[in-house]
Amino acid sequence: MPKKLKILRVQKGLSQAQLAKDLGTTQKTVSSWETGRATPRPPMMQKIADFFGVKKDDIFFEAFNYFK
C-alpha cells in the first residue's frame, strides 16, 4: 500500500501536504501511510480510492492481506 499510494500521488503531481488538504487530513498522516507506519481506516480508504479513481483493492491490497 505505501508504494502504491505514493506512486498515485506523484503521478497526479501532488505533494503530501496537497493530498492531505484534499482528503481533509494532515501531511503527517499521509506520510505515515506512505511509509507503512499506519493504515487508513476504511472510510478514508474509500475516500482515497475515489479521489484517485481506482478500486480500493488496487491501493490497499496489502493492508487487507489478500492473496491473488
Segments from the language model and where they lie:
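DNA major-groove recognition helix of helix-turn-helix/homeodomain DNA-binding modules
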Residues: 24, 43-58
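Short, charged recognition helix plus adjacent turn
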Residues: 11, 50, 58-68
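Residues in the recognition helix of alpha-helical DNA-binding motifs
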Residues: 8, 22, 33, 62
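Short alpha-helical DNA-recognition segment
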Residues: 13-32
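Short, low-complexity interaction segments enriched in Ser/Thr/Pro/Gly
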Residues: 1-3, 18, 25, 53
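A short, Lys/Arg-rich alpha-helix, primarily the initiator
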Residues: 1-11
